[in-house]
């Protein structure tokens, strides 16, 4: 399944850098060893994707040596209203929430709150007796075996915990992860469903970062969003990176599009509750909204 979002942080313009970029030092591309001509080609290539209907719009930035040398917004933030893309547009960054979670965790590690090889059951005892599906290809709650080894904190960071994906059929059936639940409830639900593999034996892209987010709350004694705001976003001056898009920011939120069978972009919502509504679930694996320049600051670390 392919989802089209207008965020192009992977390009971290020959266009002039406007007032929004004043928070970051700017420079001429050639002064940091880049090519103005080459960046102009980047603009042409991105515009070609917009013109072909592959994406609705894009905001692209290039930074080198801590200096912003390119910033370009192309296409539209919302096709239905024909709202143009802007440099300060906000995007649902989905799984790019995960590196923020890992950074917050490592800040707490530096302060001595935990060790990377600690079993997570030391802090979340509900995981102490978790078992493993006998056949992970056809998970059955009645067909399980004893687990070999414990989930370590490091397993959560490298996605080797054995936990499943929020979209796995058994997690959906068991109601493991719903945005109407609290993070503590989701973690409790995940602990009662068997693992898909023994910890540390297999890479699996699933709820690991969500569990890590709960550990951050346990270690810090704060909510996850408070830790993010105080320990990550404030020091980096990431003023537009949030879990909830308030009314003032909503006018800048880009619509997510997915191509239909004919390749036409259609609005698509992956979540049952939109980001413009406050929800109980704030998790480490998904959920942040950010701007290109905010995430460019994070990417400079």
Residue ranges and their predicted role:
Residues 122-301:
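Short, surface-exposed loop or secondary-structure junction motifs
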Residues 16-17:
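N-terminal signal peptide c-region/cleavage motif recognized by signal peptidases
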Residues 40-47, 60, 66, 91-120, ...:
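Active-site SXXK
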Residues 50, 109-110, 191, 228:
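Alpha-helix C-terminal capping/helix-coil junction sites
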